[in-house]
């Protein structure tokens, strides 16, 4: 859609020549991708399916897709999306993640999943925020990729402290018994799924959820994230 209505870039506020996904070409170019391990997401000098980091401490999931590092301007957009009630940024961020998924089909031979599962929030935190940011991203991706968004399969049943600032050991302890499944193995037909999250740090949350999904018979778990911190 051409910019007949003086649309502006959501980051720099400059005029958009084409008002489609909210970012001008200059700001989008600042969000740089990098070669990463297709398993754990660690930065590498070239694209690879595995690396020394994930072989040393293998994550519970199988594949990872990320947009870029948690640095500006991507980090600013994520913070506004999560903490400043700017839920309408979901389309812009989901579009960037969609492009990263498409790239991963080429760089990491990624096969699209049969279903998408957003990382859940504890009900009180979601009520206070007003939305689950991962679910908003999943809804957009579900529509564009024509893949079901299963936002009621994994439940967060325990209130946990924020993960920011915790060590890897404390993160694991904080998340112990924090999630549960809302379906049984017989009720879940999907064998390849993607977990959608915002910022991936140690991966403790994703590991806990991945272990539960294995109990449902899931054979391949992909992680789709906005940024690697």
From Swiss-Prot:
The keyword Ribosomal protein does not apply. The keyword Magnesium does not apply. It holds the Pfam family Pribosyltran. Gene3D superfamilies: 3.40.50.2020. Keywords: Competence. One of its GO terms (biological process) is establishment of competence for transformation. It comes from the Bacteria. Belongs to the ComF/GntX family. Involved in transformation (genetic competence for DNA uptake). PANTHER family: DNA UTILIZATION PROTEIN YHGH. This is Competence protein F. The gene is comF.
């Amino acid at each position: 859609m051409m910019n007949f209505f003086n649309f502006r870039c959501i980051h720099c506020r400059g005029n958009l020549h084409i008002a489609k996904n909210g970012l001008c070409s200059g700001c989008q170019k600042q969000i740089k991708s990098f070669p990463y391990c297709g398993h754990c997401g660690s930065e590498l000098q070239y694209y690879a399916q595995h690396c020394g980091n994930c072989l040393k401490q293998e994550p519970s999931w199988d594949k990872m897709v990320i947009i870029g590092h948690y640095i500006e301007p991507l980090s600013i957009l994520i913070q506004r999306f999560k903490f400043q009630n700017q839920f309408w940024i979901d389309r812009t961020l989901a579009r960037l993640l969609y492009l990263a998924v498409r790239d991963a089909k080429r760089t990491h031979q990624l096969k699209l999943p049969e279903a998408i599962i957003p990382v859940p929030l504890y009900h009180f935190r979601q009520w206070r925020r007003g939305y689950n940011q991962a679910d908003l991203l999943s809804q957009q991706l579900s529509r564009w990729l024509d893949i079901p968004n299963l936002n009621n399969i994994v439940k967060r049943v325990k209130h946990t402290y924020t993960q920011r600032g915790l060590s890897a050991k404390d993160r694991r302890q904080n998340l112990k018994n924090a999630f549960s499944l809302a379906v049984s193995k017989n009720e879940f037909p999907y064998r390849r799924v993607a977990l959608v999250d915002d910022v991936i740090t140690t991966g403790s949350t994703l590991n806990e959820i991945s272990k539960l999904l294995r109990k449902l018979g899931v054979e391949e778990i992909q992680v789709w994230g906005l940024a690697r911190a």
